[in-house]
């Protein structure tokens, strides 16, 4: 019963999900601005103070555009991991900011805090302005539960075979519009603008006719490039609407999306712009293609890009020449996300490559005259389990890796030409600096002394190792700078107001670099003596990260409509560039003119545009005191068809979920309850505690504690038989079955991310309340009695491993491995035979003690045969150790969560073994169809076979094992743009027919079909 409820109870967590990570190693403080609270740990103090300043400054202009002002917003600032992002929890009035500045190859250079604070706060304002109800009601739910046929006389009803839960949210803003308006923020800020990276992405898509469709723009769930393309296209279309129809239309569209029965942006467009979504999209698309073709015309007449030498993957970066016509580089090929990139070695002539090191996203450098490379990668092997960068050396010939720094947050290393030093960047409190160590990782030396959010990138040693050249950025441009290896004599080499990056020295002491000075990133060579640059490429997309060999042949990362590829350009081809044949850059794209909202005159825009974040106001610090978000309420209506004899009204069970969390995720509470006309109840409460515990914290053990309470009741009318031979002496009465359970668990990460160990204590009590009745043919009233037939306790230890590879299909068709190992020690008092004794005139149950050990293994292996096709194995083995115990404690084999060929309660025993083999493949991907508020993305189909049994006592022969065959269809969708929707349907056939005698009744199973289905948020149940 609890398992059924748990599957349904957890549904609202999806719509209100957070990064449920709280690191108790840190002290937390709070400062208060005019409109905001900022919570931070001392290591992020500067970042927190700047954020308080920025948030108060941008509050007025952003709220003015949407004519909506939220309640005070809580910012949570983290500088724990080497991770850069912002996240807005618009139902909780909370924004999380990671202090590390974003360095993303698909984005240009901007001031991180000015950009991310304005971006996330715009999310808060715009999305709340577009809500249909108060933010405390995120969604309503409709739920449907159907159950297997009840056959066994000892159960009230079967296990669920259909589970449907579907939200009707109070917000339905498409992804492109949410992200487009957030990037737009207020255009005059110029904190985020239509930079050359954004133009590059959109230009390549438009010229190759690969723009995201109107439907695709509405949802995420794509690759790294695909998701960024939603941001990119959304920003472009938002600017188009603002410039053509007026900035005020952004507000009007937002407000129309908040109308009660408006669930698509097409309807909002029609009301505000007089055209539906497809009309606006086609109008914008036609303009883009025509405009880009005109502006790129001269470049196409003199295109100098070389040949593609690595076409696989959409993220190929940081190439360096190795030896014998070989290139070492970083690539995400074979993966859907840039975070899964690895180091490869490529032969330029044969175009064949091999992987050297897994999971590396940094630059790579070669130790001269060796077979060793130096790089950085993320890891959590440190006292605080923080996910940070450190430097490693890999010996290609020996296939050996060695870590040389520990906890430095060192990234993007480069080795000196004498092989003795390594220069790298490191991050602290939102500022990056250059550091240097010896080749073995010792003798750290700080080279730059930035303290105010400045960013440095891509350091390289000069040929004589006397200085380091690198990128520098503070706002909307990048400079190429240098500093002596002593830490003295900082100077700027190239500063022109554009984005200049990725310098790499040539043999003659000059350097090549990438610059967007023409509006398109191209490779240039800078003459150190004459201080002039020569253009080496003339591309349509973009050219980055150049490297040259001794003959001045060039390899670079070039952007195309399919992502970043590696290009090879010979020395001879580099001389063919005609600098007059260049791109026509538009300063205020797309249309060149604005139709502003006209509300900014009352704000000090000069101070917002020409900001000075070096001077930060003083704020009073206070110890964080546990701010909780407002309660969120999720009303629901459940149709619960567990007893077919119930009337329609009895099956309707209204209810409510409630949740709240403190802003640091130290504590959270989640509760729910439902009740029907018969007063059958489903109640639960979950409280999570993530703060440090005495003693354990001194050993760097920080478990998450959870308290769970369950109270469930079900009612039935049963016949009491006093004389089997005389029906007139029998009577009926109501019986209420009650389950009460308390769980206390402690969960802790072990070894590394994806591995958890959980210890749990479970106390459960099962009882039956028998209603009063009159003994037949008498006037004697038997009073209502309560029979507690089980008092159980369980100590459980569970280890979970999740090794699922992140892919765009990891929900519908996972790849990788999951397993769970579980041990229980149960000590129960159980009235097996319904035996009672009279104590003080009252019937008391006579309990028998059942104390036993229990072990269980659940293993899932998902093997990719070819792209999209997987062969999957599920293995489950379980046993109650020692002598047999009553079937009340049995394992169950079948049903929706097991061997689907047989009903859940059909096969049970003290021991269990089951093997499932399935083959899953796509029937239809990239469907890209929208029906109203529903977006249909992909359909997968699988066939599977089952072999398993459950037994008590001696191991049965294999011929007694049950066999089955089935098929499943899965459809992945999105509802209301933002909410994942997963439909599944199974049909399974049981080959083996068998009977069981239970309470003197013969029950037969097998040689029949079983059907299952559901609509949930994912397929992980």
Predicted regions and their residues:
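Hydrophobic beta-strand positions that form the internal "hydrophobic ladder"
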Residues: 327-328, 373, 422, 468, ...
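Juxtacatalytic substrate-recognition/specificity segment
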Residues: 17-167, 174
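A flexible loop/linker signature enriched in serine peptidases of the S9 family
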Residues: 195, 312-316, 331-343, 355-362, ...
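C-terminal transmembrane beta-barrel domains of outer membrane proteins
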Residues: 653-662, 668-716, 726, 731, ...
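Outer-membrane beta-barrel initiation region
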Residues: 576-697, 800-812, 832, 911
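Residue-level detector of Asp-centered blade-edge/turn motifs that repeat once per structural unit
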Residues: 322-324, 368-370, 417-418, 463-464, ...
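Acidic/His/Gly-enriched intrinsically disordered linker/tail segments
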Residues: 23-24, 92, 112-116, 130-244, ...
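Beta/coil-rich, acidic/histidine-enriched accessory regions frequently appended to metallopeptidases
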Residues: 19-22, 27-30, 225-229, 253-357, ...
């Amino acid at each position: 019963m609890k398992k059924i409820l748990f599957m349904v109870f957890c549904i609202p967590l999806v719509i209100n999900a957070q990064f449920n990570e709280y690191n108790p190693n840190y002290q937390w403080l709070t400062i208060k601005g005019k409109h905001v609270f900022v919570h931070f740990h001392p290591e992020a103090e500067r970042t927190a103070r700047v954020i308080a300043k920025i948030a108060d400054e941008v509050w007025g202009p952003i709220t003015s555009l949407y004519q909506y002002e939220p309640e005070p917003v809580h910012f949570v600032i983290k500088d724990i991991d080497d991770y850069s992002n912002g996240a807005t929890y618009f139902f909780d009035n909370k924004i999380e900011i990671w202090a590390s500045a974003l360095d993303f190859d698909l984005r240009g250079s901007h001031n991180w805090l000015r950009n991310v604070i304005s971006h996330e706060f715009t999310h808060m304002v715009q999305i709340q302005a577009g809500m249909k109800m108060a933010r405390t009601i995120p969604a309503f739910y409709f739920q449907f539960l159907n159950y297997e046929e009840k056959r066994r006389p000892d159960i009230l009803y079967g296990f669920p075979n259909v589970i449907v839960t579907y939200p009707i949210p109070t917000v339905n803003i498409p992804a492109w519009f949410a992200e487009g308006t957030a990037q737009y923020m207020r255009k005059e800020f110029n904190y985020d603008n239509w930079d050359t990276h954004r133009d590059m992405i959109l230009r390549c898509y438009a010229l190759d006719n690969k723009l995201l469709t109107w439907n695709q723009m509405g949802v995420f769930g794509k690759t790294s490039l695909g998701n960024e393309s939603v941001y990119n296209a959304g920003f472009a279309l938002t600017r188009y609407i603002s410039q053509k129809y007026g900035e005020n239309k952004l507000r009007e569209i937002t407000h129309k999306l908040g109308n009660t029965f408006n669930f698509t942006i097409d309807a909002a467009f029609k009301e505000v712009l007089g055209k539906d979504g497809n009309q606006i999209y086609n109008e914008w698309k036609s303009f883009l293609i025509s405009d880009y073709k005109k502006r790129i015309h001269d470049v196409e007449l003199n295109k100098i890009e070389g040949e593609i030498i690595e076409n696989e993957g959409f993220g190929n970066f940081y190439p360096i020449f190795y030896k014998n016509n070989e290139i070492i580089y970083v690539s995400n090929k074979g993966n859907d996300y840039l975070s899964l990139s690895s180091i490869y070695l490529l032969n330029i002539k044969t175009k064949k490559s091999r992987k050297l090191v897994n999971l590396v996203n940094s630059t790579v450098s070669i130790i001269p005259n060796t077979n060793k490379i130096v790089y950085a990668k993320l890891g959590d092997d440190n006292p605080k389990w923080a996910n940070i960068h450190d430097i490693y050396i890999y010996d290609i010939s020996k296939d050996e890796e060695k870590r040389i720094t520990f906890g430095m947050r060192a990234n993007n290393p480069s080795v000196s030409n004498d092989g003795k030093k390594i220069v790298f960047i490191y991050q602290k409190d939102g500022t990056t600096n250059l550091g240097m160590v010896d080749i073995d990782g010792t003798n750290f030396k700080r080279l730059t002394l930035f303290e105010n959010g400045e960013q440095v990138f891509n350091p390289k040693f000069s040929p004589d190792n006397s200085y380091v050249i690198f990128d520098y950025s503070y706002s909307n441009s990048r400079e190429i700078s240098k500093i002596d290896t002593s830490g003295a004599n900082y100077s700027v080499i190239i500063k022109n107001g554009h984005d200049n990056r990725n310098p790499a020295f040539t043999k003659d002491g000059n350097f090549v670099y990438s610059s967007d000075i023409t509006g398109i990133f191209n490779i240039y060579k800078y003459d150190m003596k004459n201080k002039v640059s020569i253009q080496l490429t003339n591309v349509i997309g973009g050219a980055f990260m150049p490297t040259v060999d001794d003959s001045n042949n060039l390899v670079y990362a070039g952007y195309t409509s399919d992502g970043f590829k590696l290009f090879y350009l010979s020395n001879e081809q580099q001389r063919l560039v005609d600098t007059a044949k260049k791109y026509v850059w538009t300063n205020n794209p797309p249309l060149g003119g604005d139709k502003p909202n006209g509300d900014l005159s009352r704000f000090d825009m000069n101070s917002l545009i020409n900001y000075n974040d070096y001077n930060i106001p003083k704020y009073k610090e206070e110890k964080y005191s546990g701010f909780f978000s407002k309660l969120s309420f999720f009303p629901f209506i459940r149709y619960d068809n567990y007893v077919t004899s119930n009337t329609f009204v009895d099956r309707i069970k209204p209810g409510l979920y409630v949740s709240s969390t403190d802003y640091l995720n130290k504590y959270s509470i989640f509760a729910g309850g439902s009740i029907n006309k018969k007063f059958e109840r489903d109640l639960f409460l979950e409280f999570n505690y993530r703060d440090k515990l005495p003693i354990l914290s001194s050993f760097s053990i920080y478990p998450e504690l959870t308290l769970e309470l369950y109270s469930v009741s079900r009612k039935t009318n049963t016949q009491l038989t006093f004389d089997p031979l005389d029906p007139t002496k029998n009577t009926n009465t109501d019986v209420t079955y009650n389950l009460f359970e308390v769980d206390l668990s402690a969960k802790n990460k072990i070894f590394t991310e994806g591995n958890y160990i959980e210890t749990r204590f479970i106390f459960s009590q099962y009882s039956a309340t028998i209603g009063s009745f009159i003994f037949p043919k008498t006037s004697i009233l038997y009073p209502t009695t309560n029979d507690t037939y089980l008092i159980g306790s369980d100590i459980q230890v569970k280890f979970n491993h999740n090794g699922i590879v992140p892919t765009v299909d990891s929900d519908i068709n996972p790849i990788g491995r999951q397993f769970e190992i579980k041990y229980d020690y149960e000590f129960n008092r159980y009235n097996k035979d319904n035996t009672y004794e009279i104590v003080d005139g009252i019937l008391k149950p006579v309990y028998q003690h059942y104390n036993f050990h229990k072990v269980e293994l659940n293993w899932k292996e998902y093997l990719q045969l070819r792209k999209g096709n997987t062969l999957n194995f599920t293995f489950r083995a379980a046993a109650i150790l020692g002598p047999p115990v009553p079937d009340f404690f049995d394992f169950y084999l079948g049903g929706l969560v097991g061997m689907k060929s047989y009903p859940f309660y059909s096969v049970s025993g003290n021991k269990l073994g089951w093997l499932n083999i399935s083959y899953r493949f796509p029937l239809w991907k990239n469907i890209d169809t929208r029906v109203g508020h529903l977006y249909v993305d992909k359909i997968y189909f699988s066939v599977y076979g089952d072999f398993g049994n459950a037994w008590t006592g001696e191991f049965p022969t294999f011929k007694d094992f049950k066999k089955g065959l089935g098929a499943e269809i899965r459809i992945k969708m999105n509802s209301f743009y933002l909410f994942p929707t997963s439909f599944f349907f199974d049909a399974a056939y049981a080959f083996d027919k068998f009977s069981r005698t239970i309470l003197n009744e013969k029950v037969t199973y097998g040689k029949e079909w079983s059907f299952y289905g559901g609509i949930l948020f994912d397929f992980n149940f």
